[in-house]
UniProtKB/Swiss-Prot annotation:
It comes from the Bacteria. It comes from Paraburkholderia xenovorans (strain LB400). Its main location: membrane. The chain crosses the membrane at residues 5-25, 30-50. Keywords: Cell membrane, Membrane, Transmembrane, Transmembrane helix. This is UPF0391 membrane protein Bxeno_A2958. InterPro entries: DUF1328 (IPR009760). One of its GO terms (cellular component) is plasma membrane. It is found in: Cell membrane. Belongs to the UPF0391 family. It is a multi-pass membrane protein. The keyword Transmembrane helix applies.
Length: 53
């Protein structure tokens, strides 16, 4: 589960870079939303992994 959160977090960062540099201006808002969603998912799964052991 943590692996998927990291993968999607990296994808959101790459999409954000393309969106913020003007390469895909329409995707900037989507990238911002995805970035925050996957940041939350990453932190939650990280905390679950730490407290589970």
């Amino acid at each position: 589960m943590l692996h998927y959160a990291i993968v999607f977090f990296v994808i959101a960062i790459i999409a954000a870079v393309f969106g913020f540099t003007g390469i895909a201006a329409g995707a900037a808002e989507i990238a911002k939303i995805l970035f925050y969603i996957f940041l939350v998912v990453f932190v939650v799964t990280l905390l679950l992994g730490v407290f589970r052991t």
